Amino acid sequence: MLVLKTFSLFILTALAEILGCYLPYLWLKKDGSVWLLLPAAISLAVFAWLLSLHPTAAGRVYAAYGGVYIFVALGWLWLVDGIRPSTWDFVGVGVALAGMAIIMFAPR
């Protein structure tokens, strides 16, 4: 149960971060409305709050979170940008998630 809770929290955290960065990108590069900055700021605040909910030392959380962030970012690439990740992208995600699991769940 802890594994599912931790992984789900990482996914929500990554989505908040990606959305918080994607909206200013739309404003700056795709001629989006300046009003996109408001939900972007809210999303980044939610991202910071979600990071505080993780049940271990901050440095370990940030290191492990990177693996899940890569997974979610490639999902975003596929679902939002419409670009299917390559085989090597999937291999890289597998390696990153294995690293995340070692960092988060190794006996201490």
Swiss-Prot record:
Family affiliation: Belongs to the UPF0060 family.
Transmembrane regions listed in the UniProt entry: 7-27, 33-53, 63-83, 87-107
Membrane topology per record: Multi-pass membrane protein
SUPFAM superfamilies in alphabetical order: Multidrug resistance efflux transporter EmrE
Native source organism of the sequence: Methylobacillus flagellatus (strain ATCC 51484 / DSM 6875 / VKM B-1610 / KT)
Gene Ontology CC, one term: plasma membrane
Coiled-coil annotated residue ranges, if any: none
Subcellular location: Cell inner membrane
Organism domain of life: Bacteria
Record keyword Transmembrane helix present: yes
Name of the featured protein: UPF0060 membrane protein Mfla_0485
NCBIfam families cross-referenced by the UniProt entry: PRK02237.1
Keyword Transferase: no
Keywords, comma-separated and alphabetical: Cell inner membrane, Cell membrane, Membrane, Transmembrane, Transmembrane helix
